A protein has these predicted regions:
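Conserved, well-structured functional cores that handle cations and Mg-NTP chemistry
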Residues: 2-209, 213-240, 247, 254-277, ...
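Short, solvent-exposed helix-loop connector elements
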Residues: 32-33, 341, 347-356, 371-387, ...
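Generic structural signal for hydrophobic core residues of well-folded globular domains
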Residues: 50-54, 66, 78-81, 343, ...
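Short acidic (Asp/Glu) and glycine-rich catalytic loops that position anionic groups and cofactors
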Residues: 55, 70, 331-336, 343-348, ...
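An anionic, glycine-rich sequence signature occurring as long contiguous blocks
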Residues: 151-180, 236, 241-361, 424, ...
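Hydrophobic, well-ordered secondary-structure elements that form the walls
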Residues: 363, 395
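Conserved nucleotidyltransferase catalytic core and NTase-mimicking acidic/glycine-rich helix/loop elements
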Residues: 401-429
Length: 460
């Protein structure tokens, strides 16, 4: 490893940032023209507001930061304007396919994000498990689909989970503008719907990464397997598995017991399933391999990985199809991760490491969405407003990612946060000059390179 880096950004490149955003958004403007008017201008102003906001934002602060913009027009654009968000999301998927799509190394990821809310008037709000807070709380739950190819990541689809009591509440449905054709769907069903839509939209991917809540659901794993798609699913440490497939069948009626003959298939011969955490302790040293996962900002991440063929216990207590169990423990941590995958028999450890490590990038995508694009910063309570806000957030994330990729050719350690900070300076009139922001970005690059180099020398 040499102490060198690529950095050839100049002031002219900074001026091109705004031109690039203008060009990218011009390709979406037709999606913001309704039967009665065009809201393309407001759509770009909303994007600008997100790019300019330095903290938690809202439409009032967006209107203050964006020239010739007012709060009411943005409020109407998000909450009331009838533009259709579905075609925008489809276009986003096409752009993701065009710029970072790869049928071998690309991956789509299923995960959710919770948004704590006060009161009971925001669409879909309910006291339910809130992952963000780690407890039951009053919140909305969004189910999302993300995409990554290596470190390049973004969200590409969304759904709002509506609890069953919302579906049956005509008064609240009407107040929040929930369409009549919206019926109850579980979060897992929403995830499957998004996966199929991405596939139908020709989004290329080599595998599907699945969060633990969704990964433990045998129905979803089976659906993916039947469609000949590959998954790697996080699962809890107490999920049951068999190393040998037990014999199943319909047991005979017990002698002397009245009633109907049994009709449900059950495990009739074999041991009880064991928990995956118990299997970990039974593995010998020869079953573990030390494998590179990915680069981090300071060092390379390596893990001890074991792969075992197992039969997972399904929701009905029967064994599922044989698949891989991946047990992974990263260096310098006590945390152990468990994953199931239907990858082919000949799958290499390197491939498993890449698939397993890719789950990290969907977590980063949510951090990007909340930290630089205002994913959780909204006050709208309506069905339309929620979907409009999420769609515009995903669009802003796409723009930032694409500019990071483009400018990264001249600054190899450029991050999405760097790009966001550049926008905060060059879009409004600022006291800091372009030369000064360029110098700040260069200093960040040098710090990142120095951190990597120092860690490399310590671990030689």
């Amino acid at each position: 490893m040499g102490c060198r880096m690529e950095f050839s950004l100049c002031v002219k490149d900074l001026h091109n940032f705004i031109d690039k955003v203008n060009y990218m958004h011009s390709r979406y403007t037709s999606r913001f023209i309704t039967k009665t008017r065009s809201v393309a201008r407001q759509s770009f102003q909303y994007i600008q507001g997100k790019l300019l906001e330095k903290g938690k934002g809202n439409m009032c602060s967006y209107a203050k930061n964006v020239p010739d913009c007012d709060n009411q027009s943005l409020q109407h654009f998000i909450s009331d304007s009838p533009w259709d968000h579905w075609p925008v999301l489809d276009d986003i998927q096409q752009d993701v396919t065009r710029f970072i799509g790869d049928k071998k190394y690309g991956a789509i990821h299923v995960d959710e994000s919770c948004f704590p809310k006060q009161g009971r008037d925001s669409v879909g709000v309910k006291r339910q498990h809130c992952g963000r807070l780690g407890k039951v709380a009053n919140c909305q739950v969004g189910v999302f689909l993300g995409y990554n190819n290596g470190p390049y990541r973004t969200l590409i689809d969304e759904r709002l989970y509506l609890p069953e009591d919302w579906i049956d509440d005509k008064k609240r449905r009407k107040k929040c503008g929930i369409p009549d054709d919206v019926v109850f769907k579980t979060k897992v069903e929403m995830a499957w719907e998004m996966i199929l839509h991405a596939k139908d939209n020709s989004v290329p991917f080599g595998w599907i990464g699945i969060d633990c809540f969704y990964g433990r659901d045998s129905w979803l794993r089976n659906q993916i397997d039947r469609e000949d798609m590959t998954y790697i699913a996080d699962v809890p440490c107490n999920i049951g598995i068999w190393l040998e497939r037990p014999r199943t069948g319909i047991p005979p009626r017990k002698e002397g017991v009245r009633g109907r003959n049994p009709t449900r298939e059950k495990v009739i011969e074999g041991t009880d399933p064991i928990k995956v955490r118990d299997l970990k302790d039974q593995l010998d040293d020869g079953q573990w391999n030390h494998v590179f996962i990915r680069d981090t900002e300071r060092r390379e991440l390596w893990s001890n990985i074991a792969t075992v063929r197992v039969y997972p216990s399904c929701v009905d207590g029967l064994p599922g199809e044989e698949c891989w169990l991946i047990i992974r423990q990263d260096d310098n941590t006590d945390q152990v991760k468990y994953q199931l995958s239907n990858a082919p028999l000949g799958t290499s450890l390197r491939c498993f490491a890449m698939m397993s490590g890719s789950r990290y990038w969907i977590e980063r995508a949510f951090e990007d969405g909340k930290g630089i694009a205002g994913l959780a910063d909204y006050q709208t309570r309506s069905w339309t407003g929620w979907h409009h806000h999420m769609t515009m957030t995903i669009l802003a994330m796409l723009y930032i990612m694409l500019i990071t990729i483009d400018m990264g050719k001249k600054a190899e350690f450029l991050t999405v946060q760097d790009v966001k900070e550049i926008f905060e300076v060059i879009m409004p009139k600022s006291n800091i000059t372009n030369e000064e922001i360029l110098h700040l970005i260069l200093k960040k690059h040098k710090r990142r390179l120095s951190a990597r180099w120092s860690h490399h020398r310590r671990n030689k």
